[in-house]
Design a protein with these regions (language model features):
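Conserved pre-ATP/AMP-binding loop-to-beta segment of ANL
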Residues: 61, 74-92, 99, 122-128
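Conserved AMP-binding/adenylation subdomain of ANL enzymes
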Residues: 111-128, 138-176, 187-194
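Gly/Ser/Thr-rich phosphate-binding loop
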Residues: 175-180, 189-254, 273
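Conserved ATP-binding/catalytic segment of the ANL
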Residues: 262, 276-280, 286-320
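Hydrophobic alpha-helical segments in the ANL/AMP-binding
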Residues: 1-15, 24-25, 117-119, 138-151, ...
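Conserved AMP-binding A3 loop
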Residues: 88-112
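ANL superfamily adenylate-forming
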Residues: 41-84, 191-194
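Short beta-strand->loop structural element characteristic of the AMP-binding/adenylate-forming
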Residues: 2, 6-37, 101-104, 131, ...
């Protein structure tokens, strides 16, 4: 469904259902969404959201056998009508203050995001990813969906993360890699005993990948020691279509507590006067590349503040 929306030239707006009714209503209204696709279990929430917005919104229940028949007869089946600079994805950042910001990403952005995953993780067509992250998040959508699609490999798509089933899925489907967040790493450390883990066939796995927030070096080392699987710390944002930095794959040496080096884009560290700082000097992490967002939707002021020439300010501090 998500791929079909983008292929047809429409723009998808993924919704985080745990964001709450008020925030979801704001996103639907602000984005000007015309259609909501909903599962049966979330249909009541979808109806409440539609009641709160002024724009007309069609509701389609997607897990009904006849949901396609309910689409208006005027809907047209299209060939590929997209250009690489066209808008494909409008994803809202949660943000810690104020209203969420809508990030406009083009077809070029999301394909380049997938390419950056492929390059940094040396993905081949025989790789298989385990996706346990939600697709309303840039990590889940770009890293574990677009990465495999661009590299012509495959993925196992889970409804949600389950610490109980995680390693079982990897064993059953011979997954070669996975992308998670630090809270999932901690959950796996606490869930499995060494004996439970050793009883599974995990011979296919190449590495695990951590992103979305900093991974504590102690947790990182404990995971690798217990499970004997290399964990690659990375960094990315919604605005950068996920990956910016990544540690290299084994046998190359990783640096604990660091998100790594650029793959597929350029990174510099600037001071408050927009000058590049010397080595080992803390400054603002700025990135440039084909994966960088087009703009914040309906927010030209924030868009302008976020760029200096071709460099995007990530809002994070770092050093080289």
């Amino acid at each position: 469904l998500m791929m079909g929306i983008m292929y047809s030239g429409m723009i998808q707006v993924p919704l985080n259902l745990v964001a709450g009714e008020e925030q979801l209503s704001y996103i639907v209204k602000h984005s000007g969404s015309k259609i909501i696709f909903s599962s049966s279990k979330n249909i009541d929430l979808a109806k409440k959201i539609i009641q709160k917005v002024s724009n007309e919104v069609m509701l389609i229940e997607i897990d009904k056998d006849n949901f396609i028949d309910e689409i208006d007869d005027n809907f047209e089946i299209l060939e590929d009508v997209t250009e690489y600079k066209d808008n494909a994805l409008l994803m809202y950042t949660s943000g810690t203050t104020g209203k969420p910001k809508g990030v406009i990403l083009s077809h070029e952005n999301i394909i380049q995001g997938g390419k950056n995953v492929m390059i940094s993780h040396e993905m081949k067509s025989n790789d298989r990813a385990l996706c346990v992250l939600p697709l309303y998040h840039i990590n889940g959508l770009i890293v574990t969906v677009m990465g495999p699609l661009v590299s012509q490999s495959s993925l196992v798509l889970c409804e949600k993360f389950s610490a109980t089933n995680f390693w079982n899925y990897i064993s059953k489907y011979s997954c070669t890699w996975f992308s998670v967040v630090p809270t999932i790493i901690s959950a796996l450390l606490n869930k499995y005993s060494k004996d439970e883990f050793n009883s599974l066939d995990l011979s296919a796995i190449r590495f695990g990948r951590s992103a979305s927030s900093a991974l504590a070096p102690e947790t990182h080392k404990n995971f690798e020691k217990k499970f004997e699987i290399k964990m690659i710390e990375t960094m990315g944002l919604t605005e950068t279509c996920a990956p910016i930095l990544s540690n290299p794959l084994p046998p190359k040496k990783i640096k604990y507590g660091s998100p790594g080096i650029p793959y597929g884009n350029k990174v510099i560290i600037l001071d408050n006067t927009f000058k590049e700082v010397p080595r080992n000097t803390v400054g603002q992490i700025c990135v440039s590349g084909k994966n960088i967002m087009k703009e914040y939707y309906k927010n030209p002021e924030e868009t302008k503040k976020s760029f200096y020439k071709n460099w995007f300010f990530t809002g994070d501090l770092g050093l080289m």
